[in-house]
Amino acid sequence: MARLCTHTESGHYLMALDAGTGSVRAVIFDLQGKQIAVGQAEWQHLAVPDVPGSMEFDLAKNWQLACQCIRQALQKAAIPATAIAAVSACSMREGIVIYDSNGEPIWACANVDARAAHEVSELKELHDNTFEEEVYRCSGQTLALSAIPRLLWLAHHRPDIYHRASTVTMISDWMAFMLSGELAVDPSNAGTTGLLDLVTRNWKRSLLQMAGLRSDILSPVKETGTLLGHISQKAAEQCDLQAGTPVIVGGGDVQLGCLGLGVVRPAQTAVLGGTFWQQVVNLPAPVTDPNMNVRINPHVIPGMVQTESISFFTGLTMRWFRDAFCAEEKLIAERLGIDAYSLLEDMASRVPPGAYGVMPIFSDVMRFKRWYHAAPSFINLSIDPEKCNKATLFRALEENAAIVSACNLQQIAAFSGVQADSLVFAGGGSKGKLWSQILADVTGLTVHVPVVKEATALGCAIAAGVGVGVWSSLAETGEKLVRWDREHKPNPENFAVYQQAREKWQAVYQDQRALVDGGLTTSLWKAPGL
């Protein structure tokens, strides 16, 4: 039997395993929250042949990649495995893993797997077309990416898997299970299944029963930062961690990212600027939006929820623009030894606020109940090359991302009554100083940018540390460890310009959605079941 380690005897480092959409990372931190080393590997989630919308999660291959990252991080840190006081895991949300009665993982899908479009439509018709509203009022989730239609899809198309299913967890819980052999979920990640009650932070089995599905496959629920188990001998041999090292319950990537940013008190607000942009506001008590426009998720802080309004493909749109139109700028930036985005921001800083009226049409404001977007386009272009060029379009994209953020925050405030007085801007987007200032000018809020802009792994490490007594409180530790890089105050003149631009964009976007409705253009993205 493996001997159990405590943090006092095993060393002064914590490990976070971060299973993102595009990659998996093992990150080692010291007890001051400083990142010491990281091992990272990209992974892909491939479609199943003849299963439209599918995004399979390769359990065997991805576990090998996770082990590779753990070994790489230990090697880079030049520390023995005994120096790791505890390990915790976080992941993309919505992705689920199915286990059989022997505890073997037998099926998994990634976060935006959309194979169950027919099942979403079928479920919406239950209870005189009120089932989705019942799910939302209880869990804060709609059916589009929840576990309910995916389980129904398995019942319809893979009964061999469905009837063998004994337990379901999230991907972060799967990583912790592979390390410890113990199965449990945490509220922050499991909340995105649409099966967790926001008030009790526990399963609402009746939702599965209403859908005609089995309700005996739900794992125990444990709070983030509590002990799950210990590294097994088998896992130790696979990934070179020390058998007996504590494994601590982790959580969802966004909520743990907020913990790492110190966004842990009611009314605190963050904009997380990655591939998607998440506008997140902490609410003091569970409440849902009567219009079902935004999602409500359990925070990792017990008793607290977060309302989240999502901008779609914001970071991806910027990357598309850079790669499709800015080959020259990429070469120049490489010669100068700077990032291409920095060069493009420098060019865009010479364009006046409002970008000469150019209106990008990409992500809409979040409309969770009926979630789709207009066709990607630029509206109101000019053929004057002095006014309409790459710098103008790049600035217009940054301004538009901030406008969509402001609209998302406004609809959160409208139903919750929680009005932010400042916000934290993190993620890759916050590296841009111009973008950070534009966000301040558009929202009219002071924007705080942290030193650690990718804070999910830090939040996960905080959970690990709390679990073994390094720290006593998630919230207090998050506030203690966050450090600030810079602050951006809004410019009142620019705010007035952007208010007008925002009103025009909202009107134009509505017309662009009508073109999708009429079958004349193709949506940027449409939720399953629409």
From Swiss-Prot:
CDD domains named in the record: ASKHA_NBD_FGGY_AI-2K
Catalytic reaction(s) noted: (S)-4,5-dihydroxypentane-2,3-dione + ATP = (2S)-2-hydroxy-3,4-dioxopentyl phosphate + ADP + H(+)
EC number: 2.7.1.189
UniProt entry keywords in alphabetical sequence: Cytoplasm, Kinase, Transferase
Compartments where located: Cytoplasm
A Pfam family matched in the record: FGGY_C
Enzyme class (EC, first level): transferase
GO CC annotation: cytoplasm
GO MF entries: autoinducer-2 kinase activity
Swiss-Prot/TrEMBL GO biological process terms: carbohydrate metabolic process; quorum sensing
Superkingdom of source: Bacteria
Record-linked HAMAP family: LsrK
Function: Catalyzes the phosphorylation of autoinducer-2 (AI-2) to phospho-AI-2, which subsequently inactivates the transcriptional regulator LsrR and leads to the transcription of the lsr operon. Phosphorylates the ring-open form of (S)-4,5-dihydroxypentane-2,3-dione (DPD), which is the precursor to all AI-2 signaling molecules, at the C5 position.
Family listed: Belongs to the FGGY kinase family.
Name of the protein: Autoinducer-2 kinase
Native source species: Salmonella paratyphi B (strain ATCC BAA-1250 / SPB7)
Gene: lsrK
